[in-house]
Amino acid sequence: MAKSLRSKWKRKMRAEKRKKNAPKELARLKTVLAKGSNVLMDDVKEIATVVPAKKINEKMDLDVDAPEGESSKMDTELKRNKKNLRDQHGQYPVWFNQRQQKKLKSQCGKKKGKSKQAKKLAW
């Protein structure tokens, strides 16, 4: 689709607005950083638990070192039929819409008959 004049104009105006407000935004960010370095984390500790970055990194390293089969494998009890994508209860996946189900059922239904031999060429 082509870009409309309205969208081009809006994009242009947003760019000009960003250019105009850039110095104010930079000053605001600097003040936030300056305040942040002096303030203790006591206020934040009441709201959420503060965990040092080292502990998180160590935990991530342990997960990476673990064998692939143990940590990354999901516990799925449902077994799907690869041919028709139904699970053991006859349900299709959530992402499989009605049209796709109908098409798949019709394709599976066609194949149930007796197979015929190919016609031979008459020379």
From Swiss-Prot:
One of its GO terms (molecular function) is basal RNA polymerase II transcription machinery binding. Regulates dendritic and spine growth and synaptic transmission. Its main location: nucleus. The keyword DNA damage does not apply. The gene is llph. Belongs to the learning-associated protein family. One of its GO terms (cellular component) is chromosome. GO terms for biological process: dendrite extension; positive regulation of dendritic spine development. This is Protein LLP homolog. Residues 1-22, 61-123 are annotated as: Disordered. It is found in: Nucleus, Nucleolus; Chromosome. Residues 70-89 have a biased composition (Basic and acidic residues). Keywords: Chromosome, Nucleus. InterPro entries: LLPH-like. Residues 1-21, 100-123 have a biased composition (Basic residues).
